[in-house]
From Swiss-Prot:
Glycans are attached at residues 233, 402, 421, 431, 456, 647. Ca(2+) binds at residues 193, 249, 251, 253-254. It comes from Mus musculus (Mouse). Integrin alpha-V:beta-8 (ITGAV:ITGB8) is a receptor for fibronectin. It recognizes the sequence R-G-D in its ligands. Integrin alpha-V:beta-6 (ITGAV:ITGB6) mediates R-G-D-dependent release of transforming growth factor beta-1 (TGF-beta-1) from regulatory Latency-associated peptide (LAP), thereby playing a key role in TGF-beta-1 activation on the surface of activated regulatory T-cells (Tregs). Required during vasculogenesis. Heterodimer of an alpha and a beta subunit. Beta-8 (ITGB8) associates with alpha-V (ITGAV) to form ITGAV:ITGB8. ITGAV:ITGB8 interacts with TGFB1. The gene is Itgb8. This is Integrin beta-8. Keywords: Calcium, Cell adhesion, Cell membrane, Disulfide bond, EGF-like domain, Glycoprotein, Integrin, Magnesium, Membrane, Metal-binding, Repeat, Signal, Transmembrane, Transmembrane helix. GO terms for biological process: cartilage development; cell-matrix adhesion; ganglioside metabolic process; hard palate development; immune response; integrin-mediated signaling pathway; Langerhans cell differentiation; negative regulation of gene expression. Residues 146-384 form the VWFA domain. One of its GO terms (molecular function) is metal ion binding.
Amino acid sequence: MCGSALAFLTAALLSLHNCQRGPALVLGAAWVFSLVLGLGQSEHNRCGSANVVSCARCLQLGPECGWCVQEDFVSGGSGSERCDTVSSLISKGCPVDSIEYLSVHVVTSSENEINTQVTPGEVSVQLHPGAEANFMLKVRPLKKYPVDLYYLVDVSASMHNNIEKLNSVGNDLSKKMALYSRDFRLGFGSYVDKTVSPYISIHPERIHNQCSDYNLDCMPPHGYIHVLSLTENITEFEKAVHRQKISGNIDTPEGGFDAMLQAAVCESHIGWRKEAKRLLLVMTDQTSHLALDSKLAGIVVPNDGNCHLKNNVYVKSTTMEHPSLGQLSEKLIDNNINVIFAVQGKQFHWYKDLLPLLPGAIAGEIESKAANLNNLVVEAYKKIISEVKVQLENQVHGVHFNITAICPDGARKPGISGCGNVTSNDEVLFNVTVVMKTCDIMGGKNYAIIKPIGFNETTKVHIHRSCSCQCENHRGLKGQCAEAAPDPKCPQCDDSRCHFDEDQFPSETCKPQEDQPVCSGRGVCICGKCLCHKTKLGRVYGQYCEKDDFSCPYLHGDVCAGHGECEGGRCQCFSGWEGDRCQCPSASAQHCVNSKGQVCSGRGTCVCGRCECTDPRSIGRLCEHCPTCHLSCSENWNCLQCLHPHNLSQAALDQCKSSCAVMEQHRMDQTSECLSGPSYLRIFFIIFIVTFLIGLLKVLIIRQVILQWNNNKIKSSSDYRMSASKKDKLILQSVCTRAVTYRREKPEEIKMDISKLNAQEAFRCNF
């Protein structure tokens, strides 16, 4: 804290020198000097190290350090002491003009400002290692944005009823959007899936009509077709939708992400306007394929993220993979597109779970036949324009950005969370803090981009690193940039190249231990000191090149989760963060404290607000339950030998008298409760007989059930015949049956006496 205050006051002092003259300068300098001197004496002076022999090394010690380049600067006859705090150098007689220091400058571009929503458009920040700079970013939403709304519709057969609703949506939606936009345009595109097996049927009879199961005439399947560019002509939009036919495929997921990426990057084909709010409405009732799904069809070429429309048809559908969620999110943000998922059915929750991975996206559930589609679009748009969030792009190595949103209601939130319920008259402020830990390997100028999500304007932050002294570039002062000339026997190196004979210089002093490599295998030994290698991964440093800033744990692709700096293989977290990866907010430790103020009841460690018990005997959310932690038996186990003192030494007997004198003895009956040892053979036969009897009983029961079922069937058949015989014989039809002729070898003689019947008597059958 003191170092930061000294740096601030030092900058104020030198600013007074540059901006004032005469008595005002003297009074101002004296006032600032007194403050600096008082602060400087309250803490150990790290700038006055005797090992500092150069200006560059001096300025690396801290932001409060300075180097006097005055040629005849001598203090107390003890030699040159050019490195010290700025206040001490002034007190020793060094003129302010002769003090080298690393200042922090923030310059915002006020001239030629073209941004109207995000200001400032450009910021220039000059930093040195260990310093930080602040500036404010303002975001003001405009009234009645121009809006470009592109319908991307899943035209598989199951969406037939929803597509019919689109015929009348254009005119009604344009009337509702007129309340929020002065310029509203609509466009239309369709998608199904990749036109290869196993996503579609390649049978000759179905290749041109995938939805024959629905008794419908369908168009051939396709990956993505751009049907209508963005237009103000609502009638043309309705005609394009009316001409649209459905298609089909055979698997459940669709190729929605493929089509979304093409609709986002094909800016000229779609007709996206730079000044408009860009909305991409995706209508579907199924999930979408993700990256690597195309391996099933033998498609292994990764999606390149470029536009591949030819005659408004996506021509790389069968040769290029589906995009990943990260790639799709990047393209949507780069092209300032907000996505609205209009999903019907149970797949709504699948898309809702994706929203944290797609910044600026919103999911809504549509009713049967898309009856609420217009209201869904309007409500989603109102939510989009009421949220202001920012995202950092083109992260600069060695530079950390900390962004805090200051909402119109006064609330402060992390920049990635942003503010909600923002109206067109509100202004959202973002406090941006830039911290540079070390100088970049390549040096020079870099920049980062702060981008409000969904806005077509950004803020470009230029980073200027102050890693060297001005006296090194001034021929007349170059001799005062170091106290002593280097050893002529040692080679001169420029931190990147060094030509010398390794056998010429001993390397024993460059090893932390004799059995370890020179400079930890990551540097060369020159004159008894390690010169560490340069690497693109980060900075290697330390007396033996044993430290670096890239070997720390990573989280989500960022070292120390982006909330800390890597020093010596361990994460040094920024304020407000903790954990081995700096992944936990500091406030999460409060959830690990019990009512007595103990962290995890003294039996564990707190990791991201959850206790990890280090004592294997303890359990519970706060490791508060430990049934065996205080058992006297385990505590007095060593006293057991005192019960049999015959073979103990005198020292052991003395310990028994002192440590185990008050031990209570509890004798236990060790008589076995079992009358005899277990008979394994008897147990086996018992289990075998019981199992056999149970199986036999099951067989008998099943047999009885089958017999009962057969008897019931025979009985029901007999009852049926009996009921037929009891019917009135007068209503029976003729009983004339088919005559069966047969022959016997010796037919038996049958004598029959049939009396004649009268002609008037009817033939009667007697049964």
